[in-house]
Amino acid sequence: MQLHLKCILIASLYAAGCHQSNTSNTANTTDTVTAITTTEAATVTSNGTTFKKQGTLAFLGKSGADTLRKIDIQLAQTDEQRADGLMYRKSMTDDQGMLFIFPDLEERAFWMKNTYISLDIIYIADNMEIVSIQKYATPLSEESLPSYKKAKYVLEVNGGFCDKYHIAYGDKIAYQQ
């Protein structure tokens, strides 16, 4: 019995010593564990929600030639995925975002109900040009955040992302799955 307890104690100490800690002062980062499959990566954050990498997205300057920033994206393509969005997530890293893909081009409006992190909501036309940005959306707010222009895509990234990386109206995006 004592040998069994010693083995458990040694295994516990070993596991505690293997834990990696993220010491960044950024409020939107967490300790993560990444699992790679043949087609996508899933990042499980410390609060248990899962970010599934389903593609990459590049922010391009107005000319489309200069890459301003690249991020990993999770896609929201079905009605259910678009309705859930980033609800209930407590964190997201700066190199992640969610791209909502709609079947049509029309004015959009998002809200922050059940969304715990501040977001920049980027509205994008069918020609991949950014037509509107709602910056620093207030967590848990039910206020409507309209696009004011027709959009086929909506990208959600951490609040302050657009200011930090100089993303602006007229810039373009390119993404691949």
Task: Please give the residue ranges for each predicted region.
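C-terminal motif of bacterial Sec signal peptides marking the signal peptidase cleavage site
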Residues: A15-G17
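Compact, glycine-rich, soluble single-domain proteins
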Residues: H19-Q177
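Sec-dependent signal peptide recognition
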Residues: Q2-I10
